[in-house]
Amino acid sequence: NTGMTAVAQMSDWTQTVGIQQMDYEGGTGSRFDLGGGVLSVGTEPAHTNIDPHCEMAYWHYYPQYIMFGCEVAPRTGGETVIASNERVTAALKDTVTGRKLFDRGIRYVRNFSDASNSDGLVSTSTWQNEFKCNDWTVVEEQCDQRGWQLERRADGGAKVTWQEQGFEYDEKTGKHLLFTSLARHGRAFDEWPPYNALDHEDRPYHVSYADGSQLSTTDLSTLDEAFSQFTIPIHWRPGDIAVLENIAWTHSRPPYQLQRGEERKIGILVSNHKPRLRQRDLSV
């Protein structure tokens, strides 16, 4: 325990643990600035489940390390749950689901509402906010630069999709490790009105196979089972800091409930941006 009293102080500890703080660029989650380059871990309601994922697995580069820090924690619940990605991958590599993720890759989906149409598709963000403009041609240019497919909805909203490989080559182990952001699957909204009334493809974000086929109930159960075998909960106390090698450890957050007067304030900062190496051969 560091004894820090505010998560904004996390940046003071980066040199101590030997990492270089970077801006959180390219992330698709909604976050609040907590000071010192530290962001909130997310804005998802406490009663929803955040599935296991490596940070920014959907992007063309990712942070080599991520640091979590705790300022305030509830008496019970609110843990961050981590899992050894090497062990999870080993459990998946001989399954049909693991093979499909490796062979087909992943398609990420983002849906944005139109700030000028309050009667359109509901989402957690507008395309004006996401792309920081009000000009559709600028959105087209940004998507083209990123290699994203852009569709303008009839209500003025935007649907963005892009493909990425499901595994990443890890130089340290010489192995391919699962690198799919399961937390971006549309089931994240199953208990989150009004988004749970939408089809998965219309929810704020979703994940399918790269060919557009959906992960089946069996696929999701296979992934859940693999992760559940190797989970380790981090029971937070104020002043705690945890540093994870991003490709080596997934993180997730089960639902929790705050009692009257309780708060959960966890910060995140990212470091050492690393370009994707992607899959090197045909074997998992």
Can you say where each PLM-predicted feature lies in the sequence?
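N-terminal non-catalytic cap/leader segment that marks the start of a structured domain
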Residues: 1-64, 90
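Active-site environment of non-heme Fe oxygenases that use a 2-His-1-carboxylate facial triad
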Residues: 35-39, 46-52, 61-284
